[in-house]
């Protein structure tokens, strides 16, 4: 049926673009079919390819599509609470936890779900959003547009159209929780995760990934050709165009990227 050829070329079909089972946000647990899902984030686990998507009409709950890594077949949709943009997904393999980007009242947040919870989730049985594990507000970053997990830390980046931006690095404890604190000197009046450090990046960044001693950043905006830019990791943490080691040109709308082993996974919005 052509699947073997598709598998050979390493492609995964993004499900749910024509219609996705989800919930009508304004009516709680009311099942609904969304025809306007926009794919955003990408994560790779031991067994799955996971893609996040949000409703562009702002009527339905956001979702995560779970795809078999070896079979390339769609397994199920996981309904998220509310309508986060879910621009970023990140997988913590040590604690078997999936992170996704969200926000509340204009404050960037990172939300985690245990993989056991994702595997046990059944839309037909519950017609409810999945149970989350931890929700943490992020200090020091305007939006969490994309993210990745690397060497025990969650890296979160912010998309800017025309200006340089940042990647913030946040620590995780032994249980897989983001470490948060209440620091009044930083102007907080509730607990937030505080970055261990920042890196400067060029504009229009959509995704980040690490490979050996290199940092990879995807850049795209609208219908313009996309770029994948490779940098040598540096203590200066200044990853802007003029410091790049190599640049690759990609078709438009390149979104999140993930490195697993020696393989690079890239996702396109449309």
Indicate residue ranges for each PLM-predicted region:
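Conserved blade-ending motifs and adjacent loop-strand segments that build the rim/top face
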Residues: 200-201, 237-261
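Structural signature of eukaryotic scaffold interfaces centered on beta-propeller domains
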Residues: 31-45, 87-96, 139-155, 201-211, ...
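Blade-loop segments of beta-propeller domains
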Residues: 38, 63-97
């Amino acid at each position: 049926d052509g699947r073997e050829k598709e598998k050979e070329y390493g492609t995964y079909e993004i499900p749910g673009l024509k219609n996705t089972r989800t919930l009508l946000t304004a009516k709680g647990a009311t099942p609904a079919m969304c025809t306007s899902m926009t794919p955003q984030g990408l994560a790779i686990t031991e067994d799955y390819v996971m893609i996040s998507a949000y409703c562009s009409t702002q009527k339905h709950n956001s979702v995560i599509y779970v795809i078999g890594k070896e079979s390339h077949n769609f397994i199920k949709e996981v309904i998220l609470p509310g309508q986060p943009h879910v621009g970023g997904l990140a997988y913590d393999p040590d604690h078997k936890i999936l992170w996704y980007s969200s926000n509340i009242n204009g404050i960037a947040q990172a939300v985690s779900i245990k993989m056991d919870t994702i595997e046990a989730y059944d839309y037909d049985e519950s017609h409810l959003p999945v149970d989350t594990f931890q929700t943490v507000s992020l200090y020091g970053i305007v939006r969490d547009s994309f993210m990745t997990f690397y060497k025990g830390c969650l890296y979160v980046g912010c998309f800017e159209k025309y200006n340089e931006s940042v990647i913030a690095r946040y620590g995780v404890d032994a249980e897989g929780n983001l470490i948060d604190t209440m620091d009044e000197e930083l102007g907080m009046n509730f607990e937030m995760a505080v970055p261990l450090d920042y890196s400067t990046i060029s504009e229009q960044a959509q995704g980040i990934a690490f490979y050996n001693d290199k940092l990879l950043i995807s850049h795209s905006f609208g219908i313009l050709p996309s770029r994948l830019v490779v940098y040598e990791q540096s203590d200066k943490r200044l990853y802007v165009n003029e410091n790049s080691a190599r640049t690759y040109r990609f078709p438009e709308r390149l979104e999140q990227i993930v490195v697993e082993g020696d393989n690079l996974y890239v996702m396109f919005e449309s």
